[in-house]
């Protein structure tokens, strides 16, 4: 399922989407590649005050429509706990799995929910980037709270 909301602040336009449920990790980038988007840069960021979870930031462009966008992705488990994006490095991914099995660390969430914040044509304005970051923070908090208060299937 997919739920999308559109927010506007002056000339800035942002789409907030919640996609669910996915079994394990869903690579949302594949959906955008299929729509002609290209990724210029990707950064995984640990939000302040959080341990072990990451937010993925993507600089994107769509040459056919001459569009530029910033997208932030955040993944949650069914209980609303933010998750960490898997490593992009194949060797690190394999070693993390082996070490995780050896140490019997917590496994990846079985079911995940993906939050997307897509800011189209944000430009280089710090105000626009701050507005998108604020929208992301509020959306993450709201989704986490909603999921944590939802009845869990037994």
What are these regions (language model features)?
Residues 110-154:
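Surface-exposed amphipathic alpha-helical segments
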């Amino acid at each position: 399922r997919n739920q999308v909301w559109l927010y506007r602040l002056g000339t800035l336009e942002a789409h907030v989407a919640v996609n669910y449920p996915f079994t394990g990790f869903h690579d949302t980038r594949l959906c955008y590649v299929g729509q002609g988007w290209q990724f210029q840069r990707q950064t995984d960021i640990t939000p302040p005050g959080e341990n072990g979870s990451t937010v993925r930031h993507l600089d994107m462009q769509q040459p056919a429509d001459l569009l530029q966008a910033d997208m932030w992705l955040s993944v949650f488990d069914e209980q609303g706990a933010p998750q960490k994006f898997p490593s992009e490095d194949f060797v690190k991914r394999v070693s993390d799995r082996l070490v995780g099995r050896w140490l019997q660390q917590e496994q990846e969430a079985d079911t995940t929910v993906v939050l997307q914040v897509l800011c189209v044509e944000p430009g280089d304005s710090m105000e626009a980037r701050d507005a998108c970051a604020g929208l992301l923070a509020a959306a993450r908090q709201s989704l986490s709270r909603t999921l944590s208060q939802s009845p869990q299937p037994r």
